[in-house]
UniProtKB/Swiss-Prot annotation:
This is Cytochrome c6. It is found in: Cellular thylakoid lumen. Binds 1 heme c group covalently per subunit. Belongs to the cytochrome c family. PetJ subfamily. Signal peptide: none annotated. It comes from Microcystis aeruginosa. GO terms for cellular component: plasma membrane-derived thylakoid lumen. One of its GO terms (molecular function) is heme binding. The gene is petJ. Monomer.
Amino acid sequence: DGASIFSANCASCHMGGKNVVNAAKTLKKEDLVKYGKDSVEAIVTQVTKGMGAMPAFGGRLSAEDIEAVANYVLAQAEKGW
């Protein structure tokens, strides 16, 4: 499920919706909206292809796993992490 995939692959940089590399670009709802990452499609693209300091996970995770993570991130952002 999205939570366990997130814990295993994303939490080292994004624990609690934060961003240890770029503190301005968190996974909190207001930042997702600000940077146009507030949809499943946008998050799937970011996770699959990577960008800047964030590595691409397209070769490591299946499309289904990436979509599960995207849905998890959006759900957590809605709840305020």
